[in-house]
Structures are given as structure tokens and as C-alpha cells.
């Protein structure tokens, strides 16, 4: 396994699984979604806000505001199980009527090639 992917995976596991109580507390404190590796433009295409790796917690009340993932153009054209549609679940969270209030445990301006440290 690639060392960067191993660090990335361990960071996501620590922040979304091992520290699940922190996730729940932060959602209870007002965040719409919590996780690691929240990316926004210019690191992503204009209008795309994603948890890279798709490992996050979100409030059901926020998820209910999102359009159905089945309404995404690529999924309509290629199907939900198509390789072409593989990133649609990542972009779905950030493509609703408003951007979620996010707690990113990895911190702002993270660099995917330098994720040797992980918080909290």
C-alpha cells in the first residue's frame, strides 16, 4: 500500500471512527458535518465542496436538505454503479442549497501529500 494512502486512511479512521464521541459532540454543538479532509475551491473545481475520501458524519436534518444523489447528471447518464460516477457521493454533501457548517479535524489548507499528523 502507498504510504500516503495509508496515512490518509488512518487519519480518516481515527477521526471518524475511533473518536466517534467527538464527532457526535461536535454535531450536537452545531456542525452539520464532521470529518477529515474537507476540500473547497481552489483545491477543488468551482462549486465543489467535498470530504475527500468520503468519510464523515452528518446530521440527518442537513442531509434531508440535499437533492437526491440519483438526480446528479452523471448518475442519470452512467448509473450509480458506474466507474464514471465514483466521485458523486463525495460531491453530494456540498451541492445542496447551502454549504454545510463543517468541522474538519484535519484542519484548513491541508496538503494530501503531508498528512502525517492527524488531529484531534
Predicted regions and their residues:
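ER/Golgi luminal nucleotide-sugar-dependent glycosyltransferases, focusing on the catalytic module
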Residues: 1-120
